[in-house]
């Protein structure tokens, strides 16, 4: 623990410790208010970056413990210098502050630590951070660093990690009164194994074709070959394309005269179309587009001032991160860049990645890659929505719709244990879960609670982790919080009006859909400003009641798994189902609210939750088929509808439509973004359109993983690998592949909680050949394409020809 230590204020802390006796080992237990880095005798300690991570600012901080023996001088009487640098990230930072308010910005950063020394005679000493043995000052070269702002670095200043010069006595910090817990999930690392080199680079100076309506097109003066040294002069702009959008930092090897300032500006996309303003461009064609970052002039910056180096020097930011594919570089004097790379930043390490799936279709493979890169980018301390703009928050619906997909690509159990603590920290006294966790600039205010599909992540995520990993601990940790939530929505029937004091009389609902009712576009609100349409309230209540039913069903599953009262939640689920049937559905399968019958998402929830059967189900399925046909075999769903779209179609005998949607290339579709050069999943189906340009710039991310939830269906239907809740953690595997010749083949391998599961199929003429493998100790229920009878297979490798 950290007993006996104090929080010390300032942003550079140094303590010189004289060894009373010979040291055999040393551990340093640390945390901070703000992003902190540790140094012993000038050596950086620990591989994790952006410590202590994103948590509820007032309730929880994570601690990191390091074995530092190898960095010490161990002999008796020797002196060792311990130093810490703290910057505002995650604490005195805009990410914590409500938009437009001062809030936490400018709050005092602090450090807390305990050094445990073990001497050669077996005795121990504990040295805590305090105001008497530590000195503090203003950090040297790091002039400013924060999550949204970026980093400003002046290499002319000495780091000062090995000296007490220019330091004074620190203050004692009393601002944090929460709990300090050991870090165990959500740590952030550089992904050196994924380092990206330039795929294209060019210098431009001046523009042509500029007019009142257009910024014109850049004049390219030089294109650089791979590995070629790049030189930037004043008045020139260097554009570097790394070929992959991701959360990352640029890493330089460069040289310039002392005092030269280099400015690096990241972006996700380039301006095009002669910089036409009508297309949403913010500069000439070929320049970096930054308008979608929302603070392009004041945020997401990287400024570096050179010291008096006679040779090349290296630099990469350590105290922030960016979301980008491109960078734009300018300088006020000549800068020679021998090397530049983009180093991805993620909480998903190489060792955590568990699954790979490939097909014979290049576009589908790119979609899978886009999804994986979206997860790498957005599983960053918390499951964020996007890594690039002034947001980067733990949006709860984004998290729940993607959670199961994410478990196939990586072992996310510890990551979600950590995040569910953030959820509990942000839960309201009534039991309502927030729209964002942990508490941040918005999305978790007292009127951002009980948002349908968002709040439900508090139940859905633990259920997914339990199902996929066989992890009952996450149920135990969250049971009281989940019960409180279910009791709350059960008492109110999850009714929008009954909860309006908590939900702000607004719902995000099926966010960014193309349906007739959709919150973001204003189609829930009358154009004359008269307020929300009655049909919208009906829609919100219909969707929330479906989540009430889903939540209750998941609670009954988790209750059975842990020896709790499942009957209570089975009864609650039955109550929710009857409520939906009575209030929203006619006996023939038509919705009582007429506009629902023209939409996809209402029908999908009805089919998923088995609200209709017999003729009523046939009628609903026909309407749904007709709806897809009317829209040219295009989906119309948003965040919530898309999350259940493909599995629901498949479970209800409409896998043919699911495959049509997968292969669709018109807007809206998954492959539309792929055809338009996407390397990650977009926030909107139309974040960019070849004919119209950029989507709405106030909210337009090109790295937003939610729609990557289609990969859950790819794993479970294309490859035919899914977990059975009767024996979770893939001890009992459901293997039910549904192939399509347009894929040519599928190769999938998943290192599950039960061991490695393999599923590979291909077509040879009219023959379908399936090879699959079941790990030792597991059992698979195998259903072949076109059949309904499942057969049990034990551990081993098999081939079936059909």
Report residues per predicted region.
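Active-site acid/base region of carbohydrate-active enzymes
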Residues: 35, 129-138, 334-370, 376-377, ...
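Extracellular/oxidizing-compartment recognition motifs
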Residues: 5-6, 10-389, 414-415, 437-439, ...
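Non-catalytic C-terminal accessory modules of carbohydrate-active enzymes
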Residues: 103, 107-110, 114, 128-165, ...
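C-terminal capping/lid segments that line or modulate ligand- or cofactor-binding pockets
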Residues: 82, 153, 390-391, 409, ...
């Amino acid at each position: 623990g950290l007993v006996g230590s104090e929080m010390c204020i300032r942003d550079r802390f140094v303590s010189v410790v004289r060894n009373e006796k010979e040291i055999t080992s040393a551990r340093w237990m640390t945390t901070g208010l703000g992003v902190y880095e540790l140094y012993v005798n000038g050596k950086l300690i620990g591989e994790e970056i952006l410590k202590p991570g994103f948590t509820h600012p007032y309730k929880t901080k994570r601690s990191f413990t390091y074995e530092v023996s190898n960095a010490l001088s161990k002999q008796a009487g020797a002196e060792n210098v311990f130093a810490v640098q703290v910057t505002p990230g995650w604490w005195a930072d805009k990410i914590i502050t409500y938009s437009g308010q001062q809030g936490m910005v400018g709050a005092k950063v602090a450090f807390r630590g305990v050094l445990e020394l073990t001497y050669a005679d077996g005795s121990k000493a504990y040295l805590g951070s305090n105001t008497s043995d530590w000195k503090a000052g203003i950090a040297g070269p790091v002039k400013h660093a924060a999550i949204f702002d970026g980093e400003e670095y002046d290499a002319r200043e000495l780091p000062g990690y090995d000296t007490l010069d220019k330091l004074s006595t620190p203050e004692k910090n009393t601002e944090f009164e929460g709990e300090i817990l050991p870090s165990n999930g959500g740590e952030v690392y550089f992904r050196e194994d994924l380092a990206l080199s330039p795929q294209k680079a060019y210098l431009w100076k001046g523009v042509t074709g500029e007019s009142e309506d257009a910024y014109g097109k850049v004049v390219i003066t030089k294109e650089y070959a791979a590995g070629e040294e790049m030189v930037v002069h004043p008045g020139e702009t260097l554009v570097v394309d790394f070929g992959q959008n991701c959360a990352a930092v640029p890493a330089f090897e460069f040289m310039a005269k002392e005092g030269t300032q280099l400015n690096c500006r990241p972006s996700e996309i380039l301006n095009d179309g002669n910089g036409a303003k009508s297309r949403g461009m913010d500069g000439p064609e070929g320049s970096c587009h930054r308008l979608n970052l929302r603070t392009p002039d004041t945020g997401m910056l990287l400024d570096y001032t050179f010291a008096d180096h006679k040779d090349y020097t290296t630099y990469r930011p350590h105290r922030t991160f960016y979301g980008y594919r491109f960078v734009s570089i300018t300088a006020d004097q000549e800068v020679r860049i021998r090397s530049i790379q983009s180093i991805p930043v993620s909480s998903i390490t190489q060792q955590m990645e568990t699954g790979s799936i490939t097909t014979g279709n290049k576009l589908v493979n790119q979609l899978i890659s886009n999804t994986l890169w979206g997860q790498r980018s957005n599983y960053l301390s918390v499951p964020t929505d996007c890594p690039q703009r002034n947001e980067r928050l733990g949006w709860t619906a984004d998290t729940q719709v993607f959670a199961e997909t994410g478990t196939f690509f990586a072992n996310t159990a510890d990551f979600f244990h950590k995040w569910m603590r953030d959820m509990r920290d942000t839960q309201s006294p009534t039991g309502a879960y927030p729209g964002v966790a942990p508490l941040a600039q918005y999305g978790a205010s007292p009127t951002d609670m009980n948002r349908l599909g968002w709040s439900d992540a508090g139940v859905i995520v633990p259920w997914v982790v339990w199902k996929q990993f066989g992890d009952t601990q996450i149920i135990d940790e969250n049971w009281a919080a989940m019960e409180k939530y279910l009791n709350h929505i059960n008492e109110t029937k999850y009714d929008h009006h009954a909860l309006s004091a908590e939900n702000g009389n607004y719902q995000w609902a099926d966010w960014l859909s193309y349906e007739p009712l959709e919150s973001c576009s204003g189609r829930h609100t009358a154009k004359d400003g008269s307020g929300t349409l009655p049909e919208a309230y009906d829609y919100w209540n219909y969707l929330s009641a479906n989540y009430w039913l889903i939540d209750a069903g998941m609670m009954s599953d988790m209750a059975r798994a842990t020896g709790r009262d499942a009957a209570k939640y089975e009864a609650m689920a039955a109550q929710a189902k009857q409520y939906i049937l009575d209030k929203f559905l006619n006996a023939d399968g038509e919705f009582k609210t007429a506009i629902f019958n023209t939409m996809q998402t209402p029908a999908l929830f009805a089919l998923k939750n088995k609200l209709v059967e017999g003729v009523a189900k046939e009628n609903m399925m026909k309407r749904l088929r007709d709806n897809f046909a009317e829209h040219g075999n295009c989906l119309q769903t948003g965040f919530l509808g898309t999350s259940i779209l493909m599995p629901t179609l498949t479970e209800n005998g409409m896998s043919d439509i699911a495959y049509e949607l997968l292969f669709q290339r018109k807007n809206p579709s998954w492959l539309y973004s792929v055809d338009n050069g996407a390397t990650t999943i977009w926030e909107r189906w139309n974040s960019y359109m070849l004919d119209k340009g950029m989507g709405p710039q106030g909210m337009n991310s090109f790295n937003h993983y939610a729609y990557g939830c289609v990969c859950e269906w790819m794993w479970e239907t294309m490859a035919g690998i899914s977990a059975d809740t009767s024996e979770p953690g893939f001890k009992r595997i459901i293997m039910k592949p549904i192939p399509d010749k347009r894929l040519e083949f599928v190769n999938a391998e998943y290192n599950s909680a039960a061991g490695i599961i393999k599923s590979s199929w291909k077509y040879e003429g009219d023959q379908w050949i399936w090879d699959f493998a079941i790990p030792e100790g597991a059992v698979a229920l195998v259903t072949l394409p076109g059949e309904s009878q499942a057969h049990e297979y034990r551990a081993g490798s098999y081939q079936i020809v059909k």
